[in-house]
Structure formats: structure tokens, C-alpha cells
From Swiss-Prot:
Pfam families documented for this protein: RuBisCO_large, RuBisCO_large_N
UniProt record similarity statement: Belongs to the RuBisCO large chain family. Type I subfamily.
Sites where the protein binds Mg(2+): K191, D193, E194
GO biological process: photorespiration; reductive pentose-phosphate cycle
Name of the molecule in the record: Ribulose bisphosphate carboxylase large chain
Cofactor note: Binds 1 Mg(2+) ion per subunit.
Binding site for substrate: X113, T163, K167, R285, H317, S369
Organism: Cornus obliqua (Silky dogwood)
């Protein structure tokens, strides 16, 4: 018969409502906004086609393979309540479409060409179900939550951090001094800002040396293990690894990477290096809002969070719910669980479209950072629980008496909240009272309470269901 050339409707091949999904399929939930006049089945099928085996016309070489084995399938379409022009398209991809252990390849397929597709006005990837068979091809986080606690010898409470500000312009020696003061005051970690790489005012090697000195001095004086997230992000993978090697030679516990601007390939390489060499890896999500902030186009952060757990990182920034950056409580807790837990049930009220089984892949500590201060400590302890890192940048360095007292204030506030919670107090209701009580015997905390008593960042969250 020969083959039938010409353009045919996607839905004839790629819309398969009777398809039973396999345990090995990668499942995706897309929020689709088609152009006027394009029916949902056709738009959903187009998404499945363009992100798997399809192209705009029938090709002779289709006959040389088995499309039934390799094609993505749009297997379910559901309306979005309150949105006439939108719907959720569920697509199943056969596992063989993806290279093992490559987040890069997974994203190139699933969120590649299809996002520029003309028949769609907008497209957003809301969630991905990563099957155990694919999860098992990834190393994942270099160490994970439990191993990190064992390395640091810190249990039963959230960890405390602080981003060193001003983020750009300090010399290496002054930077190291600020690190020392924060760690000495009682923080567990300090952090390079994500923009700090190796600039003319402070080259990376100088910063690494002075920060290592600060860590060792603070450790000796406090008897606690301390760390500073040394940002190894660089212009090339080779340079990034060179910085991680130098950090390891200094004997420090943790390095840092900007995983979206640095890219998944670089991030996965660094995660492998970190596991091989006993370094913890802190991940910053600079650029995430470019991808995840629009409600109807791009990718939800829960997908970027899953991808990070596969690629590898021990900490990742994940919003505060209470500070200056975007984040709805239930939705934030949804992807926080996806980062930390081994098995997460489907729960649409928290934005989780699929049940996810991580089959013992190590967990990632969520980092709450951005516009938070001592008055937030009860809410943060309540929302995030013990397995988290709370980062007070301005909330430490903005203290009227200096960095070390700022650190003391945060540590006292945190310890007071943890103690109150352990004794059965209700942090949500009694939070302010707990902080006030503690400030009676901690002048540092009292001063911090005074500075930030009125600060609130009150806007409606955009990331709603």
C-alpha cells in the first residue's frame, strides 16, 4: 500500500483514553491552554506527540520503528474548575524514551520543543511521576538527611543558617570575619550568596581560605561542628570541580551550587563528586521563578524539586510561607514532603497529582530563606518541623548590636520554640508569647524582637490551586 503521506490529526494516534498506565511509565500532568478552536483531545494529543515521537507530518521512517512501543500517550483529560479555556492533560511516556540517570535528557524531551508549539497558547507542567525503575538509575542526593545529621552531630531541631550580606562587594578577609561572627554566635551554617562566584573584589580561592579559617576557629570555640556553603558554581564544569576539590582539601564539610543556572549536567557531576569525597551539597534555586512563577506557563517548582532530588543535593531552597518570597502553605508543604519523604500519596489539595515512590533515594533538607526573622521562628518550626534549615540573612546581620548577637538571638529563639513544642505547647497559638518569654533572659533576643516587631511581607500568594 505504501505509506499515507500528509498531515493527520494528532488525536488519531496520540489520544488513547483506554490506555492503562504501566508501573514503568513516566507520567506527566500538563495544564494546557489551547488556541481558540483547538479541541482538548487534539491539544492534549499534540502535547503527547511533540514531547515524544511525533512531528507535524507523517514521515516514511515511522514505518521503520514501532510507534506503539515508543509514543507518548494522552490518556486522560480533566477540566480545570473555574477556567473555561484550560484543562489538565495526563500523558504517559514509555521508559525507553529516556536516558538512564539523566535529568537533562528527561527535561529535553518532556519540556523541550513542545512549549513553543503554536496550537497552544500556554503550557505548564504541573507534576511528574518518576517510576521506581527510573529513580533507581540516579544516585540522588550525595548524603541525605540522616547521614547529614550524623556528620554534623545535630539532632532533634531544625538547622540554622545565614546568608552573608552585603552579597557583593566585601573583601575575602571581611567576608571571613562575618562568617566567623555568625558561627561563633550559634548558627550551624553560613552561606555564600548565590551571586558570589569569583569576582574582581573577591576571588574564590581567597574566600575559601578565609571561610575555612572562620569555620575552624568557631568550631574550636563552640565545640560544635560548623559549616559554610562555599559556592562552587563556575563558568565551566571543570572550574566548578576544581573549586569543589579545593574545598575538600581544606577539609570543610559542605559546598554549594546554583543548580538551575549551572545546569543539571553540571549539578549531577558535582553531586557525584560530593558523594565520592564526603562533601555535603547545598543547592540554591536561582532562576526558578523565571520557570515556575506564571500560573499557566512553565513548570511548577514541585517538578524542579523532584528533578533536584534525582540530580542530587542535600539542601534545596524551597520558600518560607511566611517571609518575603512566594509560597502557599499547603502547596509548599506538598513539595517539601516530596523532597524529604520516601513515599508521598497523591493529594490534589496540596497540588500533588501522582503518588510518588522514591524507593529509598536519600531525602533533601528544605531550606527556608528570605525575609525571615526571630518572630517567624515559631511558625517556621511549626510548618517545617525538625528536618529543615532556617536561614536568617538580614535577620542575623541586621541586628543592632552586630552579627554575633544576631546569631545568638536566632539560636535562642529556635531553641525556645523547639523546647516549647516538645513540652506540648501550641506554636501557632502561643508563638509570640514563647519568644517574649525567652527574650526576658536573652538581651540579644530582646533587641532583635524590638527591631523586627512590625515587619510583615503581606501579599496574596500567586501559587494557589
Amino acid at each position: 500500500v505504501g505509506f499515507k503521506a500528509g498531515v493527520k490529526e494528532y488525536k488519531l494516534t496520540y489520544h488513547t483514553p483506554e490506555y492503562e498506565t504501566k508501573d514503568t511509565d513516566i507520567l506527566a500532568a500538563f495544564r494546557v491552554t489551547p488556541q481558540p478552536g483547538v479541541p482538548p483531545e487534539e491539544a492534549g494529543a499534540a502535547v503527547a506527540a511533540e514531547s515524544s515521537t511525533g512531528t507535524w507530518t507523517t514521515v516514511w521512517t515511522d514505518g521503520l520503528t514501532s510507534l506503539d512501543r515508543y509514543k507518548g500517550r494522552c490518556y486522560h483529560i480533566e477540566p480545570v474548575p473555574g477556567e473555561e479555556s484550560q484543562f489538565i492533560a495526563y500523558v504517559a511516556y514509555p521508559l525507553d524514551l529516556f536516558e538512564e540517570g539523566s535529568v537533562t535528557n528527561m527535561f529535553t524531551s518532556i519540556v523541550g520543543x513542545v512549549f513553543g508549539f503554536k496550537a497552544l497558547r500556554a503550557l505548564r507542567l504541573e507534576d511528574l511521576r518518576i517510576p521506581p525503575a527510573y529513580v533507581k538509575t540516579f544516585q540522588g542526593p550525595p548524603h541525605g538527611i540522616q547521614v547529614e545529621r550524623d556528620k554534623l552531630n545535630k539532632y532533634g531541631r531544625p538547622l540554622l543558617g545565614c546568608t552573608i550580606k552585603p552579597k557583593l562587594g566585601l573583601s575575602a578577609k571581611n567576608y571571613g570575619r562575618a562568617v566567623y561572627e555568625c558561627l561563633r554566635g550559634g548558627l550551624d551554617f553560613t552561606k555564600d550568596d548565590e551571586n558570589v562566584n569569583s569576582q574582581p573584589f573577591m576571588r574564590w580561592r581567597d574566600r575559601f581560605l578565609f571561610c575555612a579559617e572562620a569555620i575552624y576557629k568557631a568550631q574550636a570555640e563552640t565545640g560544635e561542628i560548623k559549616g559554610h556553603y562555599l559556592n562552587a558554581t563556575a563558568g565551566t564544569c571543570e572550574e566548578m570541580i576544581k573549586r569543589a576539590v579545593f574545598a575538600r582539601e581544606l577539609g570543610v564539610p559542605i559546598v554549594m551550587h546554583d543548580y538551575l543556572t549551572g545546569g543539571f549536567t553540571a549539578n549531577t557531576s558535582l553531586a557525584h563528586y560530593c558523594r565520592d569525597n564526603g562533601l555535603l551539597l547545598h543547592i540554591h534555586r536561582a532562576m526558578h521563578a523565571v520557570i515556575d512563577r506564571q500560573k499557566n506557563h512553565g513548570m511548577h517548582f514541585r517538578v524542579l524539586a523532584k528533578a533536584l532530588r534525582m540530580s542530587g543535593g542535600d539542601h534545596v531552597h524551597s520558600g518560607t510561607v511566611v517571609g518575603k518570597l512566594e509560597g502557599e502553605r499547603e502547596i509548599t508543604l506538598g513539595f517539601v514532603d516530596l523532597l524529604r519523604d520516601d513515599f508521598i500519596e497523591k493529594d490534589r489539595s496540596r497540588g500533588i497529582f501522582f503518588t510518588q515512590d522514591w524507593v529509598s533515594l536519600p531525602g533533601v533538607l528544605p531550606v527556608a530563606s528570605g525575609g525571615i526573622h526571630v518572630w517567624h521562628x515559631p511558625a517556621l518550626t511549626e510548618i517545617f518541623g525538625d528536618d529543615s534549615v532556617l536561614q536568617f540573612g538580614g535577620g542575623t546581620l541586621g541586628h543592632x548590636w552586630g552579627n554575633a548577637p544576631g546569631a545568638v538571638a536566632n539560636r535562642v529563639a529556635l531553641e525556645a520554640c523547639v523546647q516549647a513544642r516538645n513540652e506540648g505547647x501550641d506554636l501557632a497559638r502561643e508563638g509570640n508569647e514563647i519568644i517574649r518569654e525567652a527574650s526576658k533572659w536573652s538581651p540579644e533576643l530582646a533587641a532583635a524582637c524590638e527591631i523586627w516587631k512590625e515587619i510583615k511581607f503581606e501579599f496574596e500568594a500567586m501559587d494557589t490551586l
